[in-house]
Amino acid sequence: MTRIKINARRIFSLLIPFFFFTSVHAEQTAAPAKPVTVEAKNETFAPQHPDQYLSWKATSEQSERVDALAEDPRLVILWAGYPFSRDYNKPRGHAFAVTDVRETLRTGAPKNAEDGPLPMACWSCKSPDVARLIQKDGEDGYFHGKWARGGPEIVNNLGCADCHNTASPEFAKGKPELTLSRPYAARAMEAIGKPFEKAGRFDQQSMVCGQCHVEYYFDGKNKAVKFPWDDGMKVENMEQYYDKIAFSDWTNSLSKTPMLKAQHPEYETWTAGIHGKNNVTCIDCHMPKVQNAEGKLYTDHKIGNPFDNFAQTCANCHTQDKAALQKVVAERKQSINDLKIKVEDQLVHAHFEAKAALDAGATEAEMKPIQDDIRHAQWRWDLAIASHGIHMHAPEEGLRMLGTAMDKAADARTKLARLLATKGITHEIQIPDISTKEKAQQAIGLNMEQIKAEKQDFIKTVIPQWEEQARKNGLLSQ
């Protein structure tokens, strides 16, 4: 019998290419991992994060609707020709995000997916279903079309997956795992030198809020959301950017001025204020750490007024008592409101005086410098007042913006007086009675009875169809 001598080293050397080839081949042919679908139903995460979920759910207690147009009818004139002249309520709890955008008169009464005045982008800050659709269809797919197209898809209120990477193992273990669920927000943060992945924990906390509490506009044919920060975040920087690209949100129906509508620029105003400069974040003031019944600390998701949790918020830094700080804040708020009203009065007159000049035959060339002043004045006013907490976030910046708005409005009216005189008009232009919201809306020609009736029909007929379809598709809990 012949004995065979086995050279182990030789065999191993022959097998190495085989193993290497097999390994590489397996790597190349393995199917790519399927991305985890964003789970938009907030109640899914209640078992893992019960305290956070219940406190988030408690935002439903912030249910009061405050009619800002009824409080200040001048707004109707300033927004003439724009949906905000129909309806503008002050913000309430996150639990009403979807309900409020459905029921506001601004979104109209569409009969089908291709109908209505507004684009899909108007859903963008209302629901984790937005993140789900962007992941599923891409940004172009999500933004395409009218607002009504999203009705059966966007059904869960702003919640967990808007701010957290809920699919991550760390989130399942109880970690926050913050994320920017809106890609356009991530690009904007990168544009100002703040890539989210490289930001510290405190920066990330405010950046997450800044996905929505921010100024933005609808860009291009697809009306995609973009933040106007290319030239900087101050009011003049954004104004310059908008002028450079010749953007306007609408044309005021009285003065025919191409206007800008500020949204809710809390991130920009917070950045400009003392809290932002010292990295006191949105979370520190609006979502403090509190104790549950067992004494365990958790982040309170009932986002609200810091004075409601004074010991856990303001008192962490300030030595003054609650009453003293409330007095300071109230005085700042009053100062801003007083100047706000003065600017609005100037702008109301400017819009009606511009209308009189146009009616008297003023040319486009004659009106251009006047309309530029009106546009810039109202933009600066709007950026100040659209940030509801500016008296707390950046009162000095708020007063500065309103001061420059007053100057611009005065410039417009001075030019208008000269132009009107060349048309033989030297008397004061009369302003109609706008002492109530209803009278102001009548003055700009709105048929509010018809608008409200159409909306009520939409609420009764279309919204139930959306919800039924969402339940059938498993997007909404039964």
Swiss-Prot record:
UniProt GO BP: anaerobic electron transport chain; nitrate assimilation
- Which PROSITE patterns did the record assign? MULTIHEME_CYTC
According to its UniProt record, this protein's enzyme class is oxidoreductase
Q: Can you cite an annotated GO cellular component?
A: outer membrane-bounded periplasmic space
Free-text remark on how the cofactor is bound? Binds 1 Ca(2+) ion per monomer.
For the ligand (Ca(2+)), the binding residues are 215-216, 261, 263
Pfam families with a match to the protein in the record: Cytochrom_C552
The protein's name is Cytochrome c-552
